[in-house]
Structures are given as structure tokens and as C-alpha cells.
Amino acid sequence: MNYTSYILAFQLCVILCSSGCNCQAMFFKEIENLKEYFNASNPDVSDGGSLFVDILKKWREESDKTIIQSQIVSFYLKLFDNFKDNQIIQRSMDTIKEDMLGKFLNSSTSKREDFLKLIQIPVNDLQVQRKAINELIKVMNDLSPRSNLRKRKRSQNLFRGRRASK
């Protein structure tokens, strides 16, 4: 790379970093708006300990943490849904919701659609309850470690086969 290329690369980095900082600053501003609206900075908010932080600290393994995070994200989406008609905080909630889903689902549109679909399933609907019970055995089988072990062995065999062929 010549001198001009270095300068152009540096300028690109500066532009990208500053736009990221700007987005981050906007994100924090929206959280501050919500804190102010909900009066969440008062000392009495900490009474009884944290809701999520202590739980998140306990889980280190990525798969375990993802399960906990999915429940937390689901909680926030339900919270935001309860205040969807509040024009004072609507923009803040929308901004945070988009950022949260983007980070949690790695900006995957299909994961986002499926996640939102799952959290909106009405638990009190009799037809939904019947379908859920009907699918329970398949869900339990999918959760079982044995099926994951089989998948892992299959992928290891594929990897070994590729390595041996080289």
C-alpha cells in the first residue's frame, strides 16, 4: 500500500468510527429519555436487587447466556408494547427495540421475524394450547442433548472426512 492508500484507509476508519459513536450516543440518549420518563434513576429503584444483571452474571457459557438473554429481550419487547401508544417515549422505545433486536439476533431478518412471532403467541388461546401440547414431544426431542450429540458427531465426521481427503 502506498502513502495515499494509507491516508484513505485512515479516513474511512475515522468516518466509520465517528458514525458508530454517533449511533452509540443516540442510543444512550434514548435510554436516558426512558430513565427520565420512568423515574428510573431514583435510589428506591435498586431496592430488592437487580432484575437481570445478577442473573446474566451467573451464566458464562454462550448457549446458556443466549437462553437467558432471549427471555430478557422478550420482557423488554412486552414492556415496550405496553407503552406503544405513549407518544412521549415512542421514538426512544423504537430506537432501543431496533438496536436490541439487531444485536440479539445478529441483524438476521428471518431470526427477527421468527422471534417476534414466537413472543406474540397468545398463551390463553385454547387452539394455541392444543397445538402446543400436540407439538410438545417434538420440541422435547429437539431439546434433548442426545440429538445435539448426534449432530456434533455427524459434523465431526464431515470435518474429518474433508481433512483426510486433502
From Swiss-Prot:
Q: What is the lineage of its organism?
A: Eukaryota, Metazoa, Chordata, Craniata, Vertebrata
Q: Which GO cellular component terms, listed alphabetically, does the Swiss-Prot or TrEMBL entry include?
A: extracellular space
Q: Which family does it belong to?
A: Belongs to the type II (or gamma) interferon family.
| GO biological process entries | adaptive immune response; astrocyte activation; cell surface receptor signaling pathway via STAT; defense response to virus; extrinsic apoptotic signaling pathway; Fc-gamma receptor signaling pathway involved in phagocytosis; humoral immune response; macrophage activation involved in immune response
InterPro entries recorded = 4_helix_cytokine-like_core (IPR009079), Interferon_gamma (IPR002069)
Major site of localization recorded for this protein: secreted
Gene3D superfamilies named among the record's database cross-references: 1.20.1250.10
Q: Which Pfam families match?
A: IFN-gamma (PF00714)
Q: What is this protein called?
A: Interferon gamma
Query: What are the annotated glycosylation sites?
Result: 39, 106
Q: Carries keyword Signal?
A: yes
Q: PTM Pyrrolidone carboxylic acid: at which residues?
A: 24
Functional summary from the UniProt entry: Type II interferon produced by immune cells such as T-cells and NK cells that plays crucial roles in antimicrobial, antiviral, and antitumor responses by activating effector immune cells and enhancing antigen presentation. Primarily signals through the JAK-STAT pathway after interaction with its receptor IFNGR1 to affect gene regulation. Upon IFNG binding, IFNGR1 intracellular domain opens out to allow association of downstream signaling components JAK2, JAK1 and STAT1, leading to STAT1 activation, nuclear translocation and transcription of IFNG-regulated genes.
Q: Name one GO molecular function term.
A: cytokine activity
**Oligomeric and partner information:** Homodimer. Interacts with IFNGR1 (via extracellular domain); this interaction promotes IFNGR1 dimerization.
Tissues expressing the protein: Released primarily from activated T lymphocytes.
The residues the entry assigns to the signal sequence are 1-23
**Record localization:** Secreted
Alphabetical keyword list: Antiviral defense, Cytokine, Glycoprotein, Growth regulation, Pyrrolidone carboxylic acid, Secreted, Signal
